[in-house]
Amino acid sequence: MACVIPAYRAAHTLRAVLEQLRGSLPCAHLIVVDDGSPDDTAALAASLADRCIRLAGNRGKGAALRAGFDEALRSDHDVVLTIDADGQHDPSYAPALIDALEGFDIVIGARLRSGSPMPLRRRMTNAMASMAIARVTGVRLHDTQSGYRAIRRRVLERVRAQGDRYEFETDFLIRAAHAGFRVRNAVVPTVYGTASHFQGMRDSARIVKTIWAHRARSEREVS
Protein backbone atom coordinates (compact mmCIF):
# COMPACT_ATOMS: atom_id res chain seq x y z
CA MET A 1 0.00 0.00 0.00
CA ALA A 2 0.97 3.65 -0.37
CA CYS A 3 0.54 6.74 1.79
CA VAL A 4 0.15 10.07 0.00
CA ILE A 5 1.05 13.06 2.18
CA PRO A 6 0.39 16.50 0.66
CA ALA A 7 2.63 19.00 2.40
CA TYR A 8 3.04 22.77 2.50
CA ARG A 9 5.20 24.61 5.02
CA ALA A 10 5.32 21.41 7.07
CA ALA A 11 8.97 21.44 8.15
CA HIS A 12 8.04 21.50 11.85
CA THR A 13 5.57 18.60 11.72
CA LEU A 14 6.50 16.35 8.79
CA ARG A 15 9.24 14.37 10.53
CA ALA A 16 6.92 13.23 13.33
CA VAL A 17 4.16 12.30 10.88
CA LEU A 18 6.48 10.20 8.72
CA GLU A 19 8.18 8.49 11.65
CA GLN A 20 4.82 7.58 13.19
CA LEU A 21 3.58 6.27 9.85
CA ARG A 22 6.67 4.06 9.63
CA GLY A 23 5.75 2.64 13.01
CA SER A 24 2.06 2.12 12.20
CA LEU A 25 2.47 0.92 8.59
CA PRO A 26 6.04 -0.41 8.26
CA CYS A 27 5.46 -1.82 4.77
CA ALA A 28 3.78 1.27 3.32
CA HIS A 29 5.37 3.27 0.50
CA LEU A 30 5.45 6.88 1.71
CA ILE A 31 4.91 9.52 -0.98
CA VAL A 32 5.24 13.16 0.06
CA VAL A 33 4.10 15.83 -2.38
CA ASP A 34 5.64 19.17 -1.47
CA ASP A 35 3.37 21.94 -2.73
CA GLY A 36 6.13 24.47 -3.38
CA SER A 37 7.04 25.05 0.26
CA PRO A 38 9.57 27.83 0.92
CA ASP A 39 10.91 26.06 4.03
CA ASP A 40 12.73 22.72 4.51
CA THR A 41 9.69 20.54 3.79
CA ALA A 42 11.11 19.13 0.55
CA ALA A 43 14.51 18.39 2.09
CA LEU A 44 12.91 16.51 4.98
CA ALA A 45 10.67 14.57 2.63
CA ALA A 46 13.60 13.61 0.42
CA SER A 47 15.46 12.18 3.40
CA LEU A 48 12.58 10.43 5.18
CA ALA A 49 9.99 9.40 2.58
CA ASP A 50 10.28 6.76 -0.14
CA ARG A 51 9.36 9.31 -2.78
CA CYS A 52 9.30 13.10 -2.76
CA ILE A 53 7.51 15.01 -5.50
CA ARG A 54 7.97 18.77 -5.56
CA LEU A 55 5.41 20.91 -7.36
CA ALA A 56 6.50 24.13 -9.05
CA GLY A 57 4.86 26.79 -6.93
CA ASN A 58 2.07 26.56 -4.38
CA ARG A 59 -0.69 24.99 -6.49
CA GLY A 60 -2.98 23.73 -3.74
CA LYS A 61 -3.89 20.56 -1.86
CA GLY A 62 -5.91 19.14 -4.73
CA ALA A 63 -3.01 19.46 -7.13
CA ALA A 64 -0.74 17.78 -4.60
CA LEU A 65 -3.16 14.89 -4.07
CA ARG A 66 -3.58 14.42 -7.82
CA ALA A 67 0.19 14.19 -8.27
CA GLY A 68 0.43 11.73 -5.38
CA PHE A 69 -2.36 9.54 -6.74
CA ASP A 70 -0.73 9.44 -10.17
CA GLU A 71 2.54 8.37 -8.56
CA ALA A 72 0.83 5.65 -6.48
CA LEU A 73 -0.90 4.25 -9.57
CA ARG A 74 2.46 3.76 -11.28
CA SER A 75 3.07 0.86 -8.87
CA ASP A 76 0.84 -2.02 -7.81
CA HIS A 77 -0.49 -0.52 -4.55
CA ASP A 78 -4.00 -1.84 -3.87
CA VAL A 79 -4.82 0.75 -1.19
CA VAL A 80 -3.80 4.39 -0.85
CA LEU A 81 -3.99 6.26 2.44
CA THR A 82 -4.05 10.06 2.47
CA ILE A 83 -2.98 11.94 5.58
CA ASP A 84 -2.16 15.59 6.20
CA ALA A 85 1.39 16.66 7.01
CA ASP A 86 0.48 19.16 9.73
CA GLY A 87 0.01 16.65 12.54
CA GLN A 88 -3.78 16.96 12.78
CA HIS A 89 -4.24 13.28 11.99
CA ASP A 90 -2.95 10.58 14.33
CA PRO A 91 -0.92 8.09 12.23
CA SER A 92 -1.50 5.35 14.83
CA TYR A 93 -5.11 5.12 13.58
CA ALA A 94 -4.03 4.34 10.01
CA PRO A 95 -4.33 0.52 10.41
CA ALA A 96 -7.87 0.91 11.78
CA LEU A 97 -8.82 3.13 8.87
CA ILE A 98 -7.54 0.52 6.43
CA ASP A 99 -9.32 -2.30 8.28
CA ALA A 100 -12.55 -0.31 7.97
CA LEU A 101 -12.31 -0.72 4.17
CA GLU A 102 -13.73 -4.23 4.54
CA GLY A 103 -16.82 -4.17 2.32
CA PHE A 104 -16.18 -0.56 1.24
CA ASP A 105 -14.13 1.37 -1.31
CA ILE A 106 -13.44 4.62 0.57
CA VAL A 107 -13.17 5.26 4.31
CA ILE A 108 -13.10 8.85 5.54
CA GLY A 109 -11.85 9.56 9.03
CA ALA A 110 -14.66 11.28 10.93
CA ARG A 111 -13.02 13.78 13.23
CA LEU A 112 -13.42 13.66 16.99
CA ARG A 113 -12.20 16.87 18.52
CA SER A 114 -9.33 16.59 20.98
CA GLY A 115 -7.01 19.34 22.12
CA SER A 116 -7.95 22.61 20.44
CA PRO A 117 -11.49 22.61 18.97
CA MET A 118 -12.19 22.57 15.25
CA PRO A 119 -12.36 26.18 14.02
CA LEU A 120 -15.98 27.35 13.81
CA ARG A 121 -15.81 28.16 10.11
CA ARG A 122 -14.45 24.71 9.29
CA ARG A 123 -17.14 23.11 11.46
CA MET A 124 -19.88 25.01 9.65
CA THR A 125 -18.41 24.21 6.23
CA ASN A 126 -18.18 20.52 7.11
CA ALA A 127 -21.77 20.33 8.39
CA MET A 128 -23.23 22.14 5.39
CA ALA A 129 -21.11 20.16 2.94
CA SER A 130 -22.13 16.84 4.49
CA MET A 131 -25.83 17.72 4.21
CA ALA A 132 -25.47 18.98 0.65
CA ILE A 133 -23.45 15.96 -0.46
CA ALA A 134 -26.11 13.67 1.02
CA ARG A 135 -28.72 15.40 -1.15
CA VAL A 136 -26.56 15.12 -4.26
CA THR A 137 -25.38 11.53 -3.80
CA GLY A 138 -27.75 9.87 -1.33
CA VAL A 139 -24.73 8.97 0.81
CA ARG A 140 -25.03 10.19 4.40
CA LEU A 141 -21.74 10.83 6.17
CA HIS A 142 -20.93 12.60 9.41
CA ASP A 143 -17.70 14.07 8.02
CA THR A 144 -17.07 14.60 4.31
CA GLN A 145 -14.19 17.06 4.51
CA SER A 146 -11.54 15.13 6.42
CA GLY A 147 -8.34 14.52 4.48
CA TYR A 148 -7.60 11.31 6.41
CA ARG A 149 -8.83 8.67 3.96
CA ALA A 150 -8.24 5.10 2.84
CA ILE A 151 -9.03 4.51 -0.82
CA ARG A 152 -8.99 1.35 -2.92
CA ARG A 153 -6.95 1.41 -6.11
CA ARG A 154 -9.98 0.75 -8.32
CA VAL A 155 -11.46 4.08 -7.22
CA LEU A 156 -8.34 6.02 -8.18
CA GLU A 157 -8.21 4.25 -11.54
CA ARG A 158 -11.74 5.38 -12.38
CA VAL A 159 -12.32 8.72 -10.63
CA ARG A 160 -10.56 11.82 -11.96
CA ALA A 161 -11.50 14.71 -9.71
CA GLN A 162 -11.33 18.38 -10.64
CA GLY A 163 -9.98 21.36 -8.69
CA ASP A 164 -6.59 22.25 -7.28
CA ARG A 165 -7.49 23.24 -3.72
CA TYR A 166 -9.73 21.76 -1.01
CA GLU A 167 -12.68 21.36 -3.39
CA PHE A 168 -10.76 18.47 -4.98
CA GLU A 169 -11.62 16.16 -2.08
CA THR A 170 -15.32 17.07 -2.31
CA ASP A 171 -15.37 16.55 -6.07
CA PHE A 172 -13.57 13.22 -5.66
CA LEU A 173 -16.11 12.01 -3.10
CA ILE A 174 -19.15 12.99 -5.20
CA ARG A 175 -17.75 11.44 -8.37
CA ALA A 176 -16.89 8.23 -6.51
CA ALA A 177 -20.38 7.99 -5.00
CA HIS A 178 -22.01 8.60 -8.39
CA ALA A 179 -19.81 5.84 -9.84
CA GLY A 180 -21.28 3.42 -7.30
CA PHE A 181 -18.32 3.12 -4.96
CA ARG A 182 -19.18 2.47 -1.31
CA VAL A 183 -18.16 5.12 1.20
CA ARG A 184 -18.22 5.17 4.98
CA ASN A 185 -16.83 7.09 7.95
CA ALA A 186 -14.58 5.73 10.70
CA VAL A 187 -13.98 7.76 13.84
CA VAL A 188 -10.48 9.19 14.31
CA PRO A 189 -9.21 11.82 16.77
CA THR A 190 -8.01 15.13 15.38
CA VAL A 191 -5.90 17.80 17.03
CA TYR A 192 -6.26 21.43 15.94
CA GLY A 193 -3.20 23.35 16.99
CA THR A 194 -1.18 24.49 13.97
CA ALA A 195 -2.43 27.12 11.55
CA SER A 196 -4.51 25.75 8.67
CA HIS A 197 -3.89 26.57 5.01
CA PHE A 198 -7.68 26.48 4.45
CA GLN A 199 -8.57 29.96 3.19
CA GLY A 200 -11.85 30.55 4.96
CA MET A 201 -14.55 31.98 2.73
CA ARG A 202 -12.59 31.48 -0.48
CA ASP A 203 -12.13 27.71 -0.06
CA SER A 204 -15.63 27.31 1.40
CA ALA A 205 -17.02 29.02 -1.71
CA ARG A 206 -15.07 26.65 -3.95
CA ILE A 207 -16.52 23.64 -2.10
CA VAL A 208 -20.08 25.00 -2.35
CA LYS A 209 -19.60 25.74 -6.05
CA THR A 210 -18.40 22.18 -6.65
CA ILE A 211 -21.41 20.65 -4.86
CA TRP A 212 -23.91 22.86 -6.70
CA ALA A 213 -22.31 22.06 -10.06
CA HIS A 214 -22.86 18.36 -9.42
CA ARG A 215 -26.43 19.00 -8.24
CA ALA A 216 -27.23 21.01 -11.36
CA ARG A 217 -25.75 18.29 -13.54
CA SER A 218 -27.84 15.62 -11.77
CA GLU A 219 -31.02 17.66 -12.22
CA ARG A 220 -30.33 18.09 -15.94
CA GLU A 221 -29.84 14.35 -16.32
CA VAL A 222 -33.16 13.64 -14.59
CA SER A 223 -35.17 16.21 -16.57
Indicate residue ranges for each PLM-predicted region.
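Catalytic donor-sugar/metal-binding loop of nucleotide-sugar-dependent glycosyltransferases
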Residues: 140, 164, 174-191
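Cell-envelope/extracellular polymer assembly enzymes that use nucleotide-activated donors
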Residues: 1-2, 29, 171
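A conserved acidic beta->alpha catalytic loop
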Residues: 34-42, 87
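Short hydrophobic beta-strand elements that form part
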Residues: 2-6, 54
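Short beta-strand-to-loop acidic/aromatic patch adjacent to the donor-nucleotide binding site
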Residues: 77-86
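Acidic helix N-cap motif at the loop->helix transition within catalytic regions
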Residues: 12-16, 39-47, 92
